[in-house]
Amino acid sequence: MFQNNPLLTQLKKNLHAKSPRVEGIVKSTERGFGFLEVDPQKSYFIPPKNMKNVMHGDKIIALLTTEKDREIVEPEKLIEPFLNRFVGKIEKKDNRLFIVPDYPFLKDLITCQPNKNCINIFQNGDWAVAQLKKHKLKGDHLFYAELTEKITQEDDPLIPWWVTLARHDLDRKEPLAEDDDLILKESDNRKDLTDLDFITIDNTNTKDIDDALFVSEKNNGDISLIVAIADPTAYIKHGSKLDVIASKRIFTNYLPGFNIPMLPRNLSEDICSLNPNKRRPVLACHITVLKNGNISNKIEFFLAWIKSKSKLSYDHVSDWIEKIGSWIPPTKSIANQILILHRLCLLRIKWRKKNAVLFKDSIEYRFHVSEHGKIIDVLIEKRRIAHKIIEESMIVANISAANFLSKNIGFGIYNVHSGFDLVNAENAVSFLRSYNLNFTVKEITTLKGFCNLRRVLNIISNNYIDSRIRRFQSFGDFSTIPGPHFALGFSEYATWTSPIRKYSDMINHRLLKSIIKKEKSIKPGEDIKIKISEQRRRNRMAERDVLDWLYTIFLQKKKYQNQKFNAEITDISRSGIRARLIENGANVFIPGTLIHPIREELNFNQESGKVFINGIMHYKISDLIQVTLSDIRLKTRSIIAKPVFEKFK
C-alpha cells in the first residue's frame, strides 16, 4: 500500500532535509569506529559502517541522527579530503598495485596505477608519491590514486630522508651551476684586507663558511670589529636561472646527517666559502663596540677582499679559553684575536642582559650518521663560549644592518616579533598575577616592558611559568619594513650573515650593495616574505619528521624497553603527556591509559598545562619525571612511554 507512494517519498525527503547537519574533521580509531570532531570540546560517534566512505582527517558535512539513545553521524558531503598529494608504500597483489598512505591512522590499501607521465616501474615495498583521484564520499565506488613518482626502493638505507623530503615536496639534490654562475661579476672597488688576520670559528666538518672576523682594541677600551661575509651575489645575477632556483629553495635544508644546499656546492662550499688561505670577495661591515657594550652609531658597509688565516673549531677555541685540553692557537696574532673576541662577547652579553633579552643555555642533540644512513649515536652538544663569541658578533652585525637599511632606504627583509597580541597580553598578565608577578597589559606590550618581563622571568628561573608565558607569545615573522623584535629585545633586526644558506640574506646583500654603490634599491614584495615563512615552516616540519623516524630506529636497535629514562614534560594534550628524554632528546608520548586506569578521573588541562587525577595535580609542563619505554612503533614513528610514578628532582 505504501510502496512507491509519492507522498511518503516526499515526506522522507522533507524529514531528511530538515535533519540537522554538523561539519567537522573525521578522527579514526584502531577499532573501526571513528569520531567527527566539530571543535576541540565536541565530537560525535561514527559507527564502523559509516567509516567506510571516509578517511581519517577528511573534512565533511554529516547528518546527525540518534541510534539507541546515542547521537551518531552519517557522512554526507566531502568538503576537503585529508589526502590529496601524499606519499605511501606500494603493495603488489595478484599483479595489481595498491598504496598504503604513510600516515598513522590510514591503514587501508588504496587501488592505484602510475599516471601517464610516470615512467617508473613499481615493485612491492617501493615508496611513491601519489595523487588521490577518487573518493567514496564523492560517489565513487572506491578510493583510487595515481602514482606520480617513485621515491625509492624498500632496501634503501636513506628511506627516512627521501620519503620525508618527498612528503613535504622539498628538493632532494643540490642545484646545478652553469659556467656563468662561477664567474665573479663584481671585482672592482673592493678594499684589500687580505693582510688582516681574519679567522673563522665553526664546526669541524662545516664546509659552507659564511663569516670571518677581525678585531682590534683601541686605547680607550673600545673594540673595532670587522665582520666579513661571503659574497655569493657577486657571482649570481638577480633574476638569473640560479637566482630563481635559490628564490624557490629559500634556505639550505639542514637535516640530521646531511644537508641539501640552496646553492650549488661548488659555490657554497668552495668558491664562496671563506676557506683558510683563500682570497675571497666579501661584503663587510666595520663596527665599533664601545667599552660599555653599546654599538657606536658609526657603521660602515663596504666590499672587500679577505684571506682567512685559520679555520678554528668551536671546541678548540672553547677549550683554550677555558684552559682545558692541549690545543693552542696556531699563531700569537690569532691567539690575540680570540682574546679580544672573548672580551667583546662578554661586553655584549653584559649589555644584552641589562638592556635586551638573553636566551637560556639549552642542550642540543645531534645524530651521528654514517655516509650510508646508519645511525651511529646521538650526541649531546652544549653551547660553549666559542658559540657565544660568534653569536654575539653576528647579532651586532645584524643590528647594524637593520639600522643601516632603515636609515638609508627604509626597507629590507627584517626579522620581527610582536611579543603579545592584546588578548594574549591580558591572559599573560592574569596568569602572572596568580604568581604575585604584577605587570600591566600596557607595560608588556611595549618593547621595554617586554624585555623587563623576560629579565624578571630569567631571574625567577621557573620553567613552568616561563613555558606558560611563551605559550601566550606571538610567533616570529618577516617584514619588508622595519619593526621590533621583542624576543631578542631589539627595535629592529635584519640578518645578512648567511647568504650562502638563506635567500633572505641574499636579498639584504643586494640592498646593502645598492646603498654602497648609490644605485636604485628595489623594495622586496610581500610575496617573497610569505615564501620565506612558508619554506621555513616546511623545512622545520621535514627536520622534525626525519628526527622522529631516526629516533624510533635508534631506540629499537638499542632495545631500550624497560630502561628508566629521565624526561622533561613538554606538552599536555587531550589524551596524554608529551615529554623529551634528557639522555638523547627523543620525544615520547605517555597516553592516559598508562597514567591512570580510570579515564573519568583523569583531567588533561591543556590551558594550564597540568594533569589532574581526582582533582589533584600530579604532573605539569616542565616537570622532570622518570619513564620507561613501553612501545616503539616504527610504522607510525612514535615512542610510547609510561611514568615510573615518582618524580625526581
Swiss-Prot record:
Q: Carries keyword DNA repair?
A: no
Q: Which reaction does it catalyse?
A: Exonucleolytic cleavage in the 3'- to 5'-direction to yield nucleoside 5'-phosphates
| Any one biological process term the GO annotation gives | mRNA catabolic process
**Domain annotation S1 motif: ranges:** 562-644
Question: Superkingdom, according to UniProt?
Answer: Bacteria
Subcellular location per UniProt equals: Cytoplasm
EC nos: 3.1.13.1
Where do the TM regions start and end? none
Which molecular function GO terms apply here?
A: exoribonuclease II activity; RNA binding
Record domain RNB: where? 190-517
* One GO term describing the cellular component: cytosol
Q: Which SUPFAM superfamilies match?
A: Nucleic acid-binding proteins (SSF50249)
User: Which InterPro entries does the annotation name?
Assistant: CSD (IPR011129), NA-bd_OB-fold (IPR012340), RNase_B_OB_dom (IPR013223), RNase_II (IPR011804), RNase_II/R (IPR001900), RNase_II/R_CS (IPR022966), RNase_II/RNase_R (IPR004476), RNR_Ribonuclease (IPR050180)
> Which UniProt keywords are present, listed alphabetically?
Cytoplasm, Exonuclease, Hydrolase, Nuclease, RNA-binding
Role of this protein: Involved in mRNA degradation. Hydrolyzes single-stranded polyribonucleotides processively in the 3' to 5' direction.
Query: Which family is annotated?
Result: Belongs to the RNR ribonuclease family. RNase II subfamily.
Spell out the protein name for this chain: Exoribonuclease 2
Record lineage: Bacteria, Pseudomonadati, Pseudomonadota, Gammaproteobacteria, Enterobacterales
